[in-house]
Amino acid sequence: MVKIRLKRAGRKKMPFYQIVAADGRAPRDGKFLEVLGHYNPTAKPHTVTIEKDRVAYWLNVGAQPTDTVHSLIRGTGLLHEMNLKRRGLSESDIAAQMEAWRQKEAERRQKRLNAKLRRRQAKKAAEAAGSAEG
């Protein structure tokens, strides 16, 4: 079975991954069929670059993405776009829905970032209050 998975590269403590199509029996960093993109988890924010047409091809011929790769592909909107095409929508409808999806996804990311900043500020305030008392 062909799997779409991550192949580790980079140096020690600085991982960088290639997204590859590989035989499921091959080792993680072993033989692969095709490079489909890359993922850099150490960048802030992390970066994902995929070749959408090739990933779509491999998914259509039955390749199974691993859980991590599935979430990375889902984050790019490719799975949503493939689902819209499968439902038989016109190109203009797909483009409109994808634009709405991108806006909603940007709002979600901004909301998560704001929540993270609020938690960080609350923690700093609590530490400052604790050090002022003690």
From Swiss-Prot:
One GO cellular-component annotation of the UniProt record comes to: small ribosomal subunit
What Pfam families does the annotation carry? Ribosomal_S16
Query: Which Gene Ontology BP terms does the record give?
Result: translation
Q: Where is this region: Disordered?
A: 115-134
Q: So which domain of life are we looking at?
A: Bacteria
Task: Spell out the InterPro entries in the cross-references.
Answer: Ribosomal_bS16, Ribosomal_bS16_CS, Ribosomal_bS16_dom_sf
According to the UniProt entry, its GO molecular function terms are:
structural constituent of ribosome
In the UniProt record, the signal sequence range is: none
- Entry keywords, A to Z: Ribonucleoprotein, Ribosomal protein
Family note: Belongs to the bacterial ribosomal protein bS16 family.
Q: What is this protein called?
A: Small ribosomal subunit protein bS16
Species per Swiss-Prot/TrEMBL record: Chlorobaculum tepidum (strain ATCC 49652 / DSM 12025 / NBRC 103806 / TLS) (Chlorobium tepidum)
